[in-house]
Regions:
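Hard-cation-handling environments
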Residues: 31-115
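C-terminal motif of bacterial Sec signal peptides marking the signal peptidase cleavage site
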Residues: 15-18
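Feature captures C-terminal
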Residues: 21-37, 86, 92-94, 100-105, ...
Length: 257
């Protein structure tokens, strides 16, 4: 009888040990790059094409309309680029619809998610550039906070700023540092107040620009039509109606010495 109990005890212990959770340990990582391009269009799965056709028609009807044209390829990069100049300028342009007259605009590089390419600009292109729900936002900063903001922009190696902003940044092993800042050719008055237009995401102090969260008289329109992509779309539509092609250039708004 003792041997029988011993056998059953051993069997139960073996069963429990086999059911215990296994602990895995990573021993290595391998990766490869799979390029998704037109090669996959050469032999499409006909059943999949038929299944997707009605959804594709709806998607194309939304994404394909042309809202304007750009004069050349535009790519976002620090410290300054044509595209990162265009977008804050669009915020300045849009401000009139809110009865606002901002002195300058800030648009974060991280919020620019794609390039624009020479020629027609569709809703798909605009959505690719500005896919987030970031909305236009207005705030008043003292000159002291403006300088703090420009110092934060300098430490990041540059962000999108509107025409009239002139920043000089130095670069060393310790990083980037603001050397000088001017607005529309004038020195920043630390006691003056400056109206700024930006995105609500930045006004909350994100992307290292905490100075924007320290201002006052904040106006944050919450209607979905105030999202940056719709403002960009409206800008292109306006230019297109006037027969104008959208253009932007690097102008020396942010210089690194």
């Amino acid at each position: 009888m003792f041997r029988l109990h011993l056998f059953y005890g051993f069997f139960v212990a073996l069963l429990l040990s086999s059911c215990a959770p296994k602990h895995y340990q990573l021993t290595g990582i391998e990766r490869t790059r799979i390029i998704i391009d037109s090669r996959y269009d050469q032999n499409p799965d006909e059943a999949a094409v038929r299944f997707m056709a009605p959804y594709k028609r709806v998607n194309d009807s939304i994404m394909a309309p042309v809202f304007g044209r750009v004069a050349h390829n535009m790519h976002p990069q620090r410290p300054e680029s044509d595209l990162s100049n265009l977008l804050p300028d669009i915020l300045i342009w849009a401000a009139k619809d809110y009865n606002e007259s901002p002195v300058f605009a800030v648009y974060n590089m991280g919020g620019i998610r794609s390039d624009l390419y020479k020629g027609d600009v569709t809703y798909e292109h605009i959505l690719s550039v500005a896919p987030f729900e970031n909305k236009i936002c207005f705030i008043t900063l003292t000159g002291e906070l403006v300088m703090k903001l420009f110092e934060q922009i300098a430490r990041r190696g540059g962000e999108g700023v509107s025409k009239g902003v002139e920043l000089v940044i130095s670069k060393s092993d310790a990083g980037y540092r603001l050397v000088s800042a001017r607005l529309h050719g004038q020195e920043i008055d630390p006691t003056a107040e400056y109206r700024v237009v930006t995105l609500d995401y930045l006004q909350e102090g994100n992307d290292g620009m905490t100075a924007l969260s320290e201002g006052k008289d904040v106006v944050k329109p919450q209607d979905p039509n105030n999202c940056s992509r719709f403002l960009i779309m409206n800008y292109f539509q306006d230019k297109h109606a006037r027969g104008e092609i959208v253009d932007a250039q690097v102008e020396g708004r942010i210089k690194i010495q």
